[in-house]
Amino acid sequence: MVASAEADVPPPTMLVKIASAGLSACLADIITFPLDTAKVRLQVQGERPNAPGVKYKGVLGTIATVAKTEGPLKLYGGLPAGIQRQISFASLRIGLYDTVQEYFNAHRKTPATLGNKISAGLMTGCVTVFIGQPTEVAKVRMQAQSSLHWLKPRYSGTYNAYYVIVKTEGFLGLWKGTSLNLTRNVIINCTELVVYDVLKEALVKNNVLADDIPCHLLAALTAGFCTTALASPVDVVKTRFINSPPGYYPHVHNCALNMLQKEGLRAFFKGFVPSFLRLGSWTVIMHVTFEQLKKELMKSRQTVDCAT
């Protein structure tokens, strides 16, 4: 990513980037979690058409229905797993992006190429999926389950979800849907980081906007929309497959085929609006906070170094 416009602030270190990415991602997750819960509920709806339960309509309608029938706190069901996911996953995939990009471009004296940026996004996206997958499985299942009186929840809490999954599905149950999540996160990581990076760089270099909050907002919002559009079909299949009981879908492709046959192509874009609202707002909050936090941490470090 392009360097900060404030010349007196030293470039952020790798640890500062990782810490800033983790903290920013956690903040973004806390703020946007109800939207993510609405997205998951809309995506799994239709999986079992005859099952008893509330029917959800639209983003705000889903949020209102969950809050009314299950209580407002249910919108944050699975938040501990979500925070754990951001700490173990987002901190590394975003925090290491610049470092990996610099590694791929080490033999050149010119700025990083588009190929370098894509390669960095691919690598950080792939590696961190395996680290964060258990938290993703627990998060999705906690968000998908309803606590209405006629539906017995599968899990009493996030840590109970980890325990029950290992007990009933084996240790590898925590990595269910890894191949799908790998595909999804490679798409998300490359699109989000590369679009943000390229657009931000273009805006600054062409003197359209300074390297500050308005520039970060525009670049992040554009990256969020592009990411949602490309990742939505994989995201829906991933959510359905991860949330399904053992044996319900023999394979990932069986889940996708079942959706296509029973619900049509539109099923692959279920929850698109909440996906964009969530991913778009998450991307904006994360990147704007990330950019500012990096600067402030380096300023603080510079002040401490000067004082000593």
From Swiss-Prot:
It comes from Suncus murinus. The modification Cysteine sulfenic acid (-SOH) is found at C255. This is Mitochondrial brown fat uncoupling protein 1. It catalyses: H(+)(in) = H(+)(out). Mitochondrial protein responsible for thermogenic respiration, a specialized capacity of brown adipose tissue and beige fat that participates in non-shivering adaptive thermogenesis to temperature and diet variations and more generally to the regulation of energy balance. Functions as a long-chain fatty acid/LCFA and proton symporter, simultaneously transporting one LCFA and one proton through the inner mitochondrial membrane. However, LCFAs remaining associated with the transporter via their hydrophobic tails, it results in an apparent transport of protons activated by LCFAs. Residues 34-74, 135-179, 234-267 are mitochondrial matrix. SUPFAM superfamilies: Mitochondrial carrier. May undergo sulfenylation upon cold exposure. May increase the sensitivity of UCP1 thermogenic function to the activation by noradrenaline probably through structural effects. It is a multi-pass membrane protein.
